[in-house]
């Protein structure tokens, strides 16, 4: 498969997301697709705009987004997570290009993050591949 994708990474949990990016890159290599561009954004709220810009490009055929939305002391993360995921779904439909969701949470407790890094990263790329066939 000869497709080019972009990856949007949330930098709030940079060290964890850098590891996710490594696994996503490995999965892209395994699947025979190319990561054409990586965009780092401050957090989850900026992911939809970065995805929109990526998917507007003719050379990008899909995208993956990687990040973490932790459980906080208020409902802020949950509300934000729902809004971001809704926007991501809408962007897939508008651009007719697949987006793989590799955002852990919302509501992830610290002990849940580590075990989910690799599976979420690989699954995000896998979803783009599956929907590109």
Residue ranges and their predicted role:
Residues 11-12, 68-69, 104-107:
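Short, ordered loop/turn segments at secondary-structure junctions
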Residues 50-87:
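Glycine-rich phosphate-binding loop
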Residues 118-133:
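A charged, well-structured terminal subsegment
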Residues 80-105, 123:
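Short, acidic/small-residue loops that bind anionic groups at enzyme active sites
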Residues 99, 106-121:
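Phosphate-binding/catalytic loops
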Residues 37-45, 105:
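Short beta->alpha junction loops
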Residues 2-40:
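Glycine-rich phosphate/diphosphate-binding loop of Rossmann-like nucleotide-binding domains
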